[in-house]
């Protein structure tokens, strides 16, 4: 299937309905089907309407009826806009996930989460934000003519995505009772944060702790990161939005915890 690079912007979109499709840009995935990089409305951790980006892929041709949907919650890539997985789609790893489902007639959607490819800081491992992104891109896919994303929904995620998937299961009835969620698979979800913190301190992956701490401090007003961080290192927090996980590890792994 050949696609063009034209970006389609919807006319007069609602400014407060989660899942409203704001724009779509075709992405070429060859004979697997059709795909788009999309921008859609979700809700921020502050409860405000926010733009979020992601990917929607479907088998070629108009759906003969409702198709089952897989909503993928991605693992940790970083906190900067440049780390949004949709910017690298299609890649070898993403196609490996998408292809088997497209071949079986599924629609596959994948959010970039709040703050990655959209305004604001990425609320890393903030479950409600992750779950909203996962749900709302399904609603966006449902509004696309011919895609047929109205069938049963399964959510899968690994690592950070596993954390998102757990919150999808926990918050489904509150956030998306309109969606027919029939299954959730949470792979390697970070859950016991006290144990994880002790394990990660001084390791090659200490940067994860800084990402989580900065995210929580930006999300919850009662948390003051400056009160627990060495003043000599505060300026390094700006580096969180200057690169992806490799850059973050390089900057923060050598800092005494």
Where are the regions that the model predicts?
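Alpha/beta-hydrolase active-site loop
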Residues: 96, 124-145
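Catalytic-loop region of hydrolases
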Residues: 1-2, 7-64
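Short, surface-exposed "cap/lid" segments of acyl-processing enzymes
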Residues: 44-103
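Accessory cap/linker subdomain of secreted extracellular hydrolases
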Residues: 187-257
